[in-house]
Protein backbone atom coordinates (compact mmCIF):
# COMPACT_ATOMS: atom_id res chain seq x y z
CA UNK A 1 0.00 0.00 0.00
CA UNK A 2 1.08 3.57 -0.47
CA UNK A 3 1.67 5.81 2.54
CA UNK A 4 1.81 9.58 2.02
CA UNK A 5 3.90 11.60 4.46
CA UNK A 6 3.87 15.29 5.32
CA UNK A 7 5.95 17.71 7.37
CA UNK A 8 8.36 16.21 9.88
CA UNK A 9 7.40 12.69 8.75
CA UNK A 10 8.52 13.46 5.21
CA UNK A 11 11.78 14.88 6.56
CA UNK A 12 12.41 11.81 8.74
CA UNK A 13 11.98 9.43 5.79
CA UNK A 14 13.38 11.62 3.02
CA UNK A 15 10.40 10.97 0.75
CA UNK A 16 6.82 12.16 0.31
CA UNK A 17 5.53 8.64 -0.28
CA UNK A 18 6.62 5.12 0.65
CA UNK A 19 5.27 1.64 -0.03
CA UNK A 20 4.40 -0.93 2.63
CA UNK A 21 3.84 -4.55 1.62
CA UNK A 22 0.53 -5.92 2.88
CA UNK A 23 -0.72 -9.42 2.11
CA UNK A 24 -4.30 -8.35 2.80
CA UNK A 25 -6.31 -5.95 4.93
CA UNK A 26 -4.48 -4.95 8.12
CA UNK A 27 -5.04 -2.57 11.03
CA UNK A 28 -3.43 0.83 10.60
CA UNK A 29 -1.42 0.10 13.76
CA UNK A 30 0.33 -2.76 11.92
CA UNK A 31 1.14 -0.49 8.99
CA UNK A 32 2.68 2.01 11.41
CA UNK A 33 4.74 -0.77 13.02
CA UNK A 34 6.02 -1.80 9.58
CA UNK A 35 6.98 1.81 8.86
CA UNK A 36 8.98 2.03 12.09
CA UNK A 37 10.80 -1.18 11.15
CA UNK A 38 11.83 0.35 7.82
CA UNK A 39 12.27 3.94 9.04
CA UNK A 40 13.24 4.01 12.76
CA UNK A 41 13.33 7.82 12.72
CA UNK A 42 9.53 7.84 12.50
CA UNK A 43 8.97 6.18 15.87
CA UNK A 44 9.10 9.35 17.96
CA UNK A 45 6.58 11.12 15.70
CA UNK A 46 3.93 8.44 15.15
CA UNK A 47 2.14 8.69 18.52
CA UNK A 48 0.89 12.16 17.52
CA UNK A 49 -0.05 11.64 13.86
CA UNK A 50 -3.56 11.61 12.48
CA UNK A 51 -4.39 8.91 9.93
CA UNK A 52 -6.67 9.26 6.92
CA UNK A 53 -7.75 7.27 3.90
CA UNK A 54 -9.27 9.47 1.23
CA UNK A 55 -11.31 12.15 3.00
CA UNK A 56 -11.99 9.96 6.04
CA UNK A 57 -10.06 10.14 9.28
CA UNK A 58 -9.29 6.65 10.60
CA UNK A 59 -8.31 5.16 13.94
CA UNK A 60 -5.33 2.86 14.36
CA UNK A 61 -7.68 -0.09 14.84
CA UNK A 62 -9.34 0.46 11.43
CA UNK A 63 -8.41 -1.91 8.63
CA UNK A 64 -6.79 -0.70 5.43
CA UNK A 65 -6.37 -2.70 2.25
CA UNK A 66 -3.28 -2.96 0.05
CA UNK A 67 -5.04 -0.93 -2.67
CA UNK A 68 -5.71 2.09 -0.44
CA UNK A 69 -3.46 5.05 0.27
CA UNK A 70 -2.87 5.88 3.93
CA UNK A 71 -2.13 9.53 4.66
CA UNK A 72 -0.19 10.39 7.82
CA UNK A 73 -0.67 13.93 9.10
CA UNK A 74 1.63 15.30 11.80
CA UNK A 75 0.33 17.90 14.25
CA UNK A 76 0.34 21.43 12.89
CA UNK A 77 2.01 24.12 14.94
CA UNK A 78 2.90 27.70 14.45
CA UNK A 79 1.61 31.12 15.19
Sequence positions of predicted segments:
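Ubiquitin-like/PB1-type beta-grasp interaction modules and other compact soluble beta-rich domains
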Residues: 1-78
